[in-house]
A protein has these predicted regions:
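Surface-exposed acidic/polar loop and edge beta-strand patches at domain peripheries
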Residues: 1-121
Length: 123
């Protein structure tokens, strides 16, 4: 499912999969890489709880060892819409059975995207 937020002639499109920004359009011009599987099919992933890769693919925290894919668990797991209006959307992801396979901790991750004029912010 895709969510579109707008401000005048400008808009952003975001997906529930990883709360990823899929499109950033200002006055009819697309400003975000649209993906090409020949090079890189992704766009603007949310990296949580890490960015990049772990040394040897492993980490230990609070006595728990885990292995984690590049850029963490958020980008490969779905989010839900927590709040939405014309120019903003807040996504939420809670730890679950899938995320705990790689990141064995409870969490709640909220990400809010807002478009105002020609500016998109995320918190």
């Amino acid at each position: 499912m895709k969510i579109k937020i707008t401000s005048g002639n400008n808009y952003a499109v975001l997906g529930l999969d990883g709360a990823m920004l899929n499109s950033l359009n200002k006055n009819g011009t697309e400003y975000l890489w649209q993906g090409n599987s020949k090079y890189w099919a992704g766009q603007a992933p949310v990296c949580f709880p890490i960015t990049g890769v772990l040394p040897n693919g492993e980490m230990e925290a609070f006595g728990k060892k885990c292995t984690m894919k590049r850029h963490g668990v958020a980008r490969i797991n779905p989010f839900e819409v927590d709040e939405q209006c014309k120019n903003s959307v807040t996504f939420v992801q809670h730890s679950n059975e899938n995320t705990k396979r790689e990141f064995p901790f409870d969490y709640e991750l909220k990400i809010k995207y807002t478009i105002c004029g020609d500016t998109v912010t995320n918190e």
